[in-house]
Each structure stands twice: as C-alpha cells, then as structure tokens.
A protein has these predicted regions:
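A general structural signal for well-ordered alpha-helical segments in protein cores
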Residues: 66-69, 134, 160
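Short, solvent-exposed polar/charged micro-motifs at secondary-structure junctions
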Residues: 8-14, 114-116, 157
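Hydrophobic (often cysteine-bearing) scaffold residues that line and stabilize catalytic clefts
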Residues: 65, 126, 155, 159
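Polybasic low-complexity intrinsically disordered regions
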Residues: 1-85, 89-102, 108
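Helix-centered, glycine/charged polyanion-binding patches within enzymatic domains
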Residues: 80, 85-152
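C-terminal domain-tail junction helix/linker
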Residues: 156-189
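Structural motif
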Residues: 33-36, 149-158
Length: 189
C-alpha cells in the first residue's frame, strides 16, 4: 500500500524565520486530512499488508502524490499497490500498467465507475492498517518531531525511526507475543 504524510519542520508561525531547510526545498502546503497549512516536506511510504515499511521517500511538500509513487515504481515490478483518493487518474493508471504494476486506488464519489463494494471495503481495511502504522510513527516513535538541523540529519532520523518500527514489528511476530498492533513497543521496551 502506498501512502503519504506531512512532515512539518517548523511550526507555521515560525516558518518564515527558518533558514536551515529552505535551501533543501522545504515549502508550504495544505494538508487536507489535518486541515492545516504546514511548512516542511512530505514522506511517501510503501507499506506491506502486515505493516512493514519497505520503502520511503522524502519529497517537497508541494509535490503531488503521483511523483512519490512513480519513484517507487522505478524500483519495483509486478506489484499490486493499493492507494487512497490521491492516487487516482487515468494517466497514472496507464503509467503504472506500462511498468507492470496494478494500481488499485479509491475513487472519489464523482467517478462514474467505481470498485465493487467488497473491494472498497478491503481497501478501507488495509488503509486503516496504514493509518495505524503512521500513527505509531508519529506518536510512539515521535517521527513528526523534527529536532534535526539539516536535511541529512532529518533523513537519518527518519530512517532510524522506520528501522525501529520494523524491528518492533519483527520481534513481535517472531516471538508471537500477543501484542496490540497499536502498541508495537510493548514487547521490546
């Protein structure tokens, strides 16, 4: 499943005084899910159905979700990728088909053709899993709390958070610990 989340580097009111990330391309963008404008970047992630993050990319905040998906498509072949409404469009579907990737994304209600109800429910169920993964990254691993002073430090910090998340998921599955998916650090820490 492919998904993206905002990564603000400064609070909105202090962003105009920011100098450290401006050279790296940090900019303003609106986040419709959080109903706020933020200054920073956007993280695109490719997540398995079990909840492991297999690939991620940090892009400018103003970059469309399609670009993050196209970068993932260059490195992966013969995949079935689930996405939300940000990954719809005939041009994107044709582009993914040419790379032998099946893209199944939720379509807005204005579309004439939509997936059957069972497929939409399946996509919603897997989307909840992805939202749990991102909430774990932001709440338990504090991924959205940026303490880095450079873009390289930001990337390193995010890599460590994602590695920690994947290790916690692996330990919980190896030891078959009865652990709620919302508390991945329960076994390790």
């Amino acid at each position: 499943m492919v998904y993206s989340f905002p990564l603000p580097v400064y609070k909105f009111g202090r962003a105009r005084f920011c100098r450290s990330f401006r050279a790296d391309g940090a900019n303003y963008e609106k986040c419709p899910s959080k109903k706020e404008t933020y200054y920073g970047f956007k993280v695109h992630a490719l997540i398995t159905l079990e909840g492991y993050i297999t690939a991620f990319k940090i892009t400018l905040a103003s970059i469309d979700d399609w670009e993050g998906l196209r970068d993932f498509a260059e490195n992966h072949l013969n995949l079935v990728i689930l996405g939300d409404k940000g990954y719809t469009g005939e041009q994107l579907l044709e582009d993914m088909r040419s790379k032998s990737i099946c893209l199944m994304s939720l379509k807005p209600s204005s579309y004439k053709t939509n997936w059957p109800k069972e497929v939409r429910q399946l996509i919603f169920r897997f989307r909840r899993r992805v939202e749990i993964v991102f909430s774990q990254l932001s709440e338990q691993m504090k991924a959205e709390r940026v303490l880095a002073k450079s873009f390289r430090g930001l990337c390193t910090r995010l890599q460590n958070k994602i590695l920690g998340h994947n290790l916690c998921m692996a330990f919980n599955s190896i030891f078959r610990e009865a652990c709620d998916i919302g508390r991945i650090k329960q076994l390790v820490f």
